[in-house]
Amino acid sequence: MTFRFLCWLTGLLLCTAAYAIPQRVISLAPHATEMAYAAGMGEQLIAVSAWSDYPPEAKKLEQVASWQGINLERILALKPDLILAWREGNPQRPLEQLANFSIPIVYLDAKTLDDIPASLRQLATYSRHPEQAERAATDFQQQIGELQHADEKHKAAHTAPLRVFIQFGTQPLFTSSKATLQSQIVSLCGAENIFSDSTVPWPQVSREQVLRRQPQAIIIGGASDKIANTQAFWQPQLTVPVITVNEDWFSRSGPRLLLAAQQICSQLAELKLAPSSAK
C-alpha cells in the first residue's frame, strides 16, 4: 500500500510540476524574445513584439506589440499564461490591465551585465528546458569573465584607457552614461566613456561638448559602411578611428550583448596597439 501511495504521489507531483510550466508565452520586446529562446522557451512562445527577428524562427510568430503600443485585445484572445515584458519599453497601463486578468508578467529589465545571466536563470523556472537556460547563463558569465581578465592584464601593463565616445545618431546627437549596459561594455574592454559622468542614462549632447572631451575613438552601431559618413560628420575638428558594432547586439539587453562586447573589445585592443592611439 505504501509503495503504491508513493508511486501515486510521485506521479501527481510530476504532473503538477509539468502543469506549472507555462505553455502559452508572449514576449513584448525583441530582447525578451531572444532571452526566451536562449532559455529554451522557443516552443512555448505564441506571439512576440515587432522587430523580434532573432532567432529567425521568431519572425514566424504573430506580432502583438510595437513602438505604437500593445494590442491588448489580441493578447487576451490568445489566452497567454505568461507574459515577458520590459518596463522601459512597454506602456504601463496595458500591462496593469493584463495583470488585472491574473496573467503572470515577468519583467526583463537588465541594468548590468550580471543581470543577463540572472534573467536567464529566472526564466529557467518557466522553461521546458531549464538546463538550456543554465548553460546559456554559465556561458555568458564565463566569456564575460575572460574579457574582464584580459582588461585586468592591460591595466597591469599600465596601459592608459582610451577615451571613447559612444555615438547614437547625429541630429540630434545622443550618447550613453555609465548607467547603461553599453557604457559597461566599454569599461569592460578597458576604455573610458567620455560621458560616463552624465546624470541621465541617455544624454543629448552637442558637437562642441564632444570635441571638448577629446575622444580618441568613436563607437557607432551599424555596418562598416557607416564609418565614412561618421568621419565626415566630425572632420576637420576630429579625426579619430570609428568602431562599428552590430546594432542589434549592442542595443538589446539580451544574450547577444556578449557578441557586442567581444567585437568592441577586439577592435579597441587593436587601437591600443596602434601608435596613433597613444595621443
From Swiss-Prot:
Pfam families: Peripla_BP_2 (PF01497). Keywords: Disulfide bond, Periplasm, Signal, Transport. Residues 24-276 form the Fe/B12 periplasmic-binding domain. The keyword Disulfide bond applies. The record marks E73, E208 as: Important for BtuC binding. Disulfide bonds join C189-C265. InterPro entries: ABC_transptr_periplasmic_BD (IPR002491), ABC_transptr_vit_B12-bd (IPR023544), Vit_B12_bind_prot (IPR054828), Vitamin_B12-ABC_binding (IPR051030). It is found in: Periplasm. GO terms for cellular component: periplasmic space. GO terms for biological process: cobalamin transport. GO terms for molecular function: cobalamin binding. Residues 1-20 form the signal peptide. Part of the ABC transporter complex BtuCDF involved in vitamin B12 import. Binds vitamin B12 and delivers it to the periplasmic surface of BtuC. The complex is composed of two ATP-binding proteins (BtuD), two transmembrane proteins (BtuC) and a solute-binding protein (BtuF). Belongs to the BtuF family. This is Vitamin B12-binding protein.
